[in-house]
Amino acid sequence: MFKKTLVTSAVLTTLLAHAAQAETFRVGMGDPIDSDQGALAQRFKELVEQLSEGEMQVELFPGGQLGSETSMIQDTRIGKLDFALVGVGNLTPYAARLGALTMPYAIRSHADAVKATTGTLADRWNAIAEEEAGVHIVSWLYSNFRYLTNSQRPVTALEDIEGLKIRVPQNELMLATYEAWGASPISMSWPEVFTGLQQGVIDGQDNPYIVNYTMKFHEVQDYLTEVHYQYSLQPIVMGVRTYEKLSDEERAIIDRAGLEAQLYALQFQLTEASKARAAMEEEGVEIATLEDEEEWIRIAKEEVWPEFYDAIGGQESFEEMQKALGH
C-alpha cells in the first residue's frame, strides 16, 4: 500500500510539473470559428500542441473577442497578445511595403498567391513586417478573391458601382481603388460591418465567398459580383519581441506549425469556397460577373498603381514582384 501511494504521488508530481511547464499562447481573429480563419487557426493549434508534445498550448479567440484587427495588431506589437490572424491590408498602416500584395490585380490566381507567400518572396514580406511593423509572420491564410457584395443593385459594369458606399479596411490603397472606379468607399472596422450593412450606413463590402457566407452577409446583401481585383491574404502574426523571447526550439515549432497549417488552409479554401458560393445562391443572393473587367484593370493600372509605387517600395520593386509571379 505504501509503495502504491508513493507511485501515485510520483505520477501526480510529474503531471503537475508538466502542467506547470506548459506555456499557453492566445490567438485572436475577427471571423467565426467555422470560417477559413477558424480552419487555419484550429490546424495551427493542433500542430503546435502536437509538435511540442503538449508543452505549448494554444487558445483561440474567434469572432473579434479580443477587439478589432487593428487593435489586435497593436497588441501583438507590444506583447500583450501572442498571435493575431488579420487581413494583410490591416498591416499596411504599420508596414506600407506590404501594400504590394494588395495592389489591385497584382495577384491574379491561386498559384500567384502561393508563390507570393512562399520561398524568397515570403522571406521578403517577413523581413519587412519585422522591420517596419514589429511583427513576425508565422503563416498565411489563402482566402481567395475579395468579391463585391451590395444591397442596392447588380454590378456588372463600371457604371453600376458609381456612388455605392463600399466598406473598406483602414487601407489607403483600397480607398483609392474604389474611388478611381467611382464608388464612395468608407473605412470601417471589421466588427462594425454587419451592423453597418444592416442599418444602411454602407451599401456593400468585399470579401471572399467563405467569409461572406460565414458572416451571414446574405442576410443583408442581395447582390454579389466576382471582381478579381484583390486576392485576400491573411497572415498570422506574432510580435517580434514575443517571438525573440522564445527558445530556438519553440520558434522552430511555431514556424513549422505555421507552414503546415498554411498548406492545409489552401486545400480547405479550394474545397470550401465553391460550397459557400452555392449556399449563398440558395439564400437568394444574385451572383454576377463583370462584362468589362478589362476597363476596371486599366483604371487600376493607370490611376492607382502610379499613386502608390513610392509607398510600397517603388515601381522597380513592385515590377520585380510581378516578374517573379510571371506577369
PLM feature segments, named:
Residues 11-12, 23-112, 121-327:
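N-terminal secretory/targeting leader peptides
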Residues 1-7:
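Bacterial N-terminal signal peptides that target proteins for export
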Residues 7-16:
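Hydrophobic helical h-region of N-terminal Sec-dependent signal peptides
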Residues 16-22:
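Sec/Tat signal peptide C-region and signal peptidase I cleavage site
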